[in-house]
């Protein structure tokens, strides 16, 4: 792992940080003295899981996010939610935060559902990004979707500046 200027970053396991258990979330955040929650947990792959098992998609991407927002509000913590730019129709690319939303697939609908909870809480930031790894291994994901990718490591480099913002950033 590359070092960043960010300090005291924790990556808890599912066992120690259960997003379906409000008490588990609260205990962990208090114990570790967390000030900002970067919510990257999500059901994403395989993409067709969102069509085959809708309840899994709802639980992990909507209910889990709602639980995190509830606890962040209780503890007055900032939450940064990693959403997706798939919440846009995907016809033109380079979307602005104010462009109309029309999720491309069930995965995007589930991420938009999570966004709804996050937007209700004012001490929050939603990042609508499409992250991928280096080297870029997905020569194609969708043949009829225009999107902008960003590499994981580039998102991490931006966090020191992003944590000051609230609202939505593409």
Task: Describe these PLM feature segments.
Residues 102-130:
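Active-site Tyr-X1-5-Lys
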Residues 64, 68, 72, 117-118, ...:
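Hydrophobic positions on the long internal alpha-helix
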Residues 66-102:
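Conserved Rossmann-fold NAD(P)-dependent oxidoreductase catalytic core, especially the SDR/UDP-sugar
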Residues 138-167:
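Substrate-positioning beta->alpha
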Residues 20, 52, 56-67, 101, ...:
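Glycine-rich NAD(P)-binding loop of the Rossmann-fold in SDR/ketoreductase-type enzymes
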Residues 12, 37-41, 79-85, 89, ...:
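SDR active-site strand-loop-helix element
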């Amino acid at each position: 792992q590359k070092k960043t200027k960010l300090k005291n970053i924790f990556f808890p396991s599912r066992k120690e940080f259960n997003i379906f258990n409000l008490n588990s979330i609260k205990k962990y955040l208090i114990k570790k003295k967390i000030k900002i929650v970067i919510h990257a947990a999500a059901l994403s792959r395989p993409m067709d899981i969102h069509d085959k098992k809708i309840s899994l998609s709802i639980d992990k991407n909507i209910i889990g996010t709602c639980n995190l927002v509830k606890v962040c509000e209780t503890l007055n913590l900032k939450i940064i939610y990693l959403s997706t730019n798939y919440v846009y129709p995907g016809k033109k690319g380079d979307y602005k935060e104010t462009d109309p939303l029309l999720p491309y697939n069930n995965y995007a609908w589930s991420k938009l559902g999570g966004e709804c909870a996050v937007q209700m809480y004012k001490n929050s930031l939603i990042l609508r990004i499409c992250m991928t790894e280096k080297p870029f291994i997905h020569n194609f994901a969708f043949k009829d979707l225009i999107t902008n990718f960003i590499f994981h490591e580039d998102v991490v480099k931006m966090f020191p500046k992003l944590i000051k913002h609230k609202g939505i950033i593409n």
